Amino acid sequence: MKTTFLDFEQPIAELEAKIEELRFVQDDSAVDISEEIERLSKKSQQLTKDLYANLSPWQVSQIARHPQRPYTLDYVAELFTDFHELHGDRAFADDLSIVGGLARFGGHPCMVIGHQKGRDTKERAARNFGMPRPEGYRKAERLMRLAEKFGLPIFTFVDTPGAYPGIGAEERGQSEAIGRNLYVMAELKTPIITTVIGEGGSGGALAIAVADTVMMLQFSTYSVISPEGCASILWKSAAKAPEAAEALGLTAHRLKALGLIDKIINEPLGGAHRDPKGMAALLRRALADSLRQFQGMSIDALRERRFERLMAYGKFKETTPGA
């Protein structure tokens, strides 16, 4: 698949286009231009490295939303075996914006749950662009209860702009469904490992992210509101989104510094979408390390650790100027 470049990546796009052109010429020419292709490839790689070393929060937000970025089902295919998807909340409908089911990780049974946005127009509409309705969260709760019953660890993957704010969703109890998931996950008697793989949008993300370990991919985001939404409220203009992204502190490094997440998983050069298999390999190691941490831990110790972790959110320290 041809790589889609973001606006701020245009210098890289131009170099890659030139390299592709030279490769095409070389195939139809007796002249050896392999050295020039290699030189430009190294230049493109260095340019990418320099650009990605100095990304603004707004640019990170754009990468987190990249249309070619791996989604939950892409990681399921790479990381898990024997995946059997489970459908429906047993109350209203099957919300396709949340996928989940039984699987094996490293040969051991587990439960996998995550947001799914969709690749093309038809699938995006069917999956509501990754914005769950109440039935999606209730499906997630049902699967988590099932995992608890059989003592299966739960892996969740977060990638949503937020919970769907439509009238029907509100009528069916959107806030209740989200709130119930927060309550249920805080009390579950099985390990929960969450990874933010793209966008972590507000309560819509948190409803499957109350976990024993929360990790973020290097160029993912996690925030109470989107930069555009924040800008529209504070400045009455979505054009102020770059400033809002800076103020929100939504990047993985910022959240790790604040103690809100446990680990950052580095992405391949240029982002996860440039090397999905490489990203999956890095994620596999991180998930295995996290799961190993909870093996042999008693249920009481696990829940106590989770409670202490949750209660640590919002702690602050008062300082006296000049002290």
UniProtKB/Swiss-Prot annotation:
Q: Which GO terms describe its cellular component?
A: acetyl-CoA carboxylase complex
Q: Which reaction does it catalyse?
A: N(6)-carboxybiotinyl-L-lysyl-[protein] + acetyl-CoA = N(6)-biotinyl-L-lysyl-[protein] + malonyl-CoA
Q: Which UniProt keywords apply?
A: ATP-binding, Cytoplasm, Fatty acid biosynthesis, Fatty acid metabolism, Lipid biosynthesis, Lipid metabolism, Nucleotide-binding, Transferase
Give the record's GO biological process terms.
fatty acid biosynthetic process; malonyl-CoA biosynthetic process
The pathway to which it is assigned is: Lipid metabolism; malonyl-CoA biosynthesis; malonyl-CoA from acetyl-CoA: step 1/1
In the Enzyme Commission scheme, what number(s) does this protein have? 2.1.3.15
Please indicate which superkingdom the organism of origin belongs to. Answer: Bacteria
Q: Does the keyword Lipid biosynthesis apply?
A: yes
Gene Ontology molecular-function annotations: acetyl-CoA carboxylase activity; ATP binding; carboxyl- or carbamoyltransferase activity
Q: Where in the cell is it found?
A: Cytoplasm
Q: Where is the CoA carboxyltransferase C-terminal domain?
A: 39-293
Fill in the subunit field for this protein.
Acetyl-CoA carboxylase is a heterohexamer composed of biotin carboxyl carrier protein (AccB), biotin carboxylase (AccC) and two subunits each of ACCase subunit alpha (AccA) and ACCase subunit beta (AccD).
Question: Could you say which protein family the record assigns here?
Answer: Belongs to the AccA family.
Report the protein's function.
Component of the acetyl coenzyme A carboxylase (ACC) complex. First, biotin carboxylase catalyzes the carboxylation of biotin on its carrier protein (BCCP) and then the CO(2) group is transferred by the carboxyltransferase to acetyl-CoA to form malonyl-CoA.
Protein name per UniProt: Acetyl-coenzyme A carboxylase carboxyl transferase subunit alpha
Species: Burkholderia cenocepacia (strain HI2424)
